[in-house]
Amino acid sequence: MSGISAQLVKKLRDLTDAGMMDCKKALVEVAGDLQKAIDFLREKGLSKAAKKADRIAAEGVIALEVVPDFKSAMMVEINSETDFVAKNEGFKELVKKTLETIKAHNIHTTEELLKSPLDNKPFEEYLHSQIAVIGENILVRKIAHLKAPSFHIINGYAHSNARVGVLITIKYDNEKNAPKVVELARNIAMHAAAMKPQVLDSKDFSLDFVKKETLALIAEIEKDNEEAKRLGKPLKNIPTFGSRIELSDEVLAHQKKAFEDELKAQGKPEKIWDKIVPGKMERFIADNTLIDQRLTLLGQFYVMDDKKTIAQVVADCSKEWDDHLTITEYVRFELGEGIEKKAENFAEEVALQMK
């Protein structure tokens, strides 16, 4: 255990929610490299994958405004030190003025915001004056400012607790469908607020990310299967791939031929293969795109109809409305995401259990 500090074990536990001794062993195994220890735990199926954002202490609000014509929208994350201050009327006024300034000066970054004028002085001066009045450090941490070109609609959703906000842009072709597209965008934004997709589409993933996530996923399924086997329950299929970006034309053609060879070996007449193979291919794709189903907006199953993915919902609306709909932008803010939880007096407890 030489060189592995109690603080490092605590940090790994906060990041993964794995057991303390598992964290200790992982750090020893990888010579104290935190990122490698996280990967080690995930590949062993020991990480409970607790998101850092679920464990942070940052307070404040996520606020957004969608203009009445649904052609632009602003969203901002403003952090305070305590929840009490976030509910303060002075803080609420600061949030309102922040959105107004973003809108008035076409701002897209926090740097632009701080330099922008408000009441004949830089916004940064106004912010400092409010920090002095309110008595806590306040940070404008993130800004999203979306603009919609012709035949695009922007809508969004902010959770009532002001801790999550989502903006969605949808492209459409038929102007008469605009009101329905507005409603669809809001419903999908509500879905994303609840289900936390990381990206819009699997194309937004890197191959390295997918391979790493797939290893962790396989370890998780194998661990679940051990318990299922013990209880006499059906086992889950172990995937070869994790995302649609791995399923090249060559991979799909190879799998189709494998299914056809299997049917041939079973003595099934070739004339019925076309009725069997598509269903097998559909199941193969579903089993081998689990990362997409978990982490992409288009790949997730819709909370209002869990038999359809978001992509299928959009396709069905396109067909029903005689239109061609495409989600072109997706932005999700969650309060404090990526900020580490304030250190607690926990290192001593870890140290005692490591002796």
UniProtKB/Swiss-Prot annotation:
Main location (coarse class): cytoplasm
Alphabetized UniProt keyword annotations: Cytoplasm, Elongation factor, Protein biosynthesis
GO molecular function terms listed in the Swiss-Prot or TrEMBL record: translation elongation factor activity
Region (Involved in Mg(2+) ion dislocation from EF-Tu): 82-85
Cellular component aspect of the GO annotation: cytoplasm
A Pfam family that the UniProt record links to this protein: EF_TS
Domain of life: Bacteria
Localization per Swiss-Prot or TrEMBL: Cytoplasm
InterPro entries assigned to the protein according to its UniProt record, in alphabetical order: EF-Ts_dimer_sf, Transl_elong_EFTs/EF1B, Transl_elong_EFTs/EF1B_dimer, Transl_elong_Ts_CS, UBA-like_sf
HAMAP family from the UniProt entry: EF_Ts
Function as written in the Swiss-Prot or TrEMBL entry: Associates with the EF-Tu.GDP complex and induces the exchange of GDP to GTP. It remains bound to the aminoacyl-tRNA.EF-Tu.GTP complex up to the GTP hydrolysis stage on the ribosome.
PANTHER family noted in UniProt: ELONGATION FACTOR TS (PTHR11741), ELONGATION FACTOR TS, MITOCHONDRIAL (PTHR11741:SF0)
Family: Belongs to the EF-Ts family.
Official protein name in the record: Elongation factor Ts
Organism, scientific name: Helicobacter pylori (strain Shi470)
Taxonomic lineage of the native organism: Bacteria, Pseudomonadati, Campylobacterota, Epsilonproteobacteria, Campylobacterales
Designated gene of the protein: tsf
